[in-house]
Amino acid sequence: RSLIIGKRLQIVHVTFYGSSSTTQRQEIIEVSTFRALLEESGEHIAQSGRILRDNVWGNQAEDAARRDFTINAMYYDPASERVLDYHHGMADIKNKLLRMIGDPTQRYREDPVRMLRVVRFAAKTQFEIEPKSLEPIASLAHLIHDVPSARLFDEMLKLLVSGHAWSSLRTLRDVGLDQGLLPMLDAILEKDGQTSFAKLALDRTDQ
């Protein structure tokens, strides 16, 4: 029932099976341990700054520091029934703000997929991307093409089935991340009068 997956970030998928009077249900629970920030080492970092492998174990505070956005760096302690908020994520949720933890340029270089994630989160939550987190994206967009195709496919699939496909695509184009990720869609959008067709198709996908 347990399967270790991932190369850079290893996690365990634990499968649970349940049933009711009418259906059988399968649920996958994702399990991982706390990780720490990778110490600088050429062995694990590509020339572009992308982290190739960082299975370094740490404590909860260290794990929070290596997360991408403040809203993703909160933990719930069921024993004390408290939310542990290391980077003011609750305040950013109240202000509807997506903020990168640490230096945005460095964090995007470490994992360029974060640029796609911030677009997906912004479209899905209708949060504003904090200016310092938004500013480096246009100049770092080329790093997306160094990411393994399997990871890009997975992230783009999440983006397109998020229920906010058109909004996500529009944000991708606004920040300069769209070219080359979906070549067929690029070709459609570059033709006069085809934008409405693409919007209709993606709106239907959202339904």
Please state what every model-predicted region is:
Residues 1-207:
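Catalytic cores of the polymerase beta-like nucleotidyltransferase superfamily
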